[in-house]
Amino acid sequence: MIGLSYLLVQVVSFAGILVIDHRWKLAAFRAPAAAALAVTASVALLLTWDVLGVRSGVFFRGQTDFMTGLLVAPEIPFEEVVFLAFLSHLALVCAAGVSRAVDHARDSRAARASRPSRMTGERR
């Protein structure tokens, strides 16, 4: 069971971001095809980076009892793929959340500016 610890933490974290995404319809629950394409492309790019790092001797898999031991390629554990997918989706959710917050702030500011002032009845 301890061999699944890291993967379990990743899955729980991924689920938390999916809940946030679902609640505010930020990425996968707003445009599922676009989000899937972005996450897939990002994971492919990052896995390519990992493979190049392994080949050049910069990256290697550390030994630990907390990982499953499943490898998708030499020196690249299954948990790495899950982490890269999580990281990619997290980036989409963060970018969409910041964009929505900025839009909301701008719209609120514009709405306040168009209302008449309480004191003079003039627009600000």
From Swiss-Prot:
Localization (cell): Cell membrane
Disulfide links within the chain: none
One of the protein's GO biological processes: carotenoid biosynthetic process
Main location: membrane
Domain of life: Bacteria
Keyword Metal-binding in annotation: no
Single GO MF descriptor: lycopene beta cyclase activity
Residues passing through the membrane, by range: 1-21, 34-54, 78-98
Functional note: Involved in the biosynthesis of C(50) beta-cyclic carotenoids. May have C(50) carotenoid beta-cyclase activity and produce the C(50) beta-cyclic carotenoid C.p.450 from the C(50) carotenoid dihydrobisanhydrobacterioruberin (DH-BABR).
Protein name: Putative C(50) carotenoid beta-cyclase subunit A
Source organism of the structure: Dietzia sp. (strain CQ4)
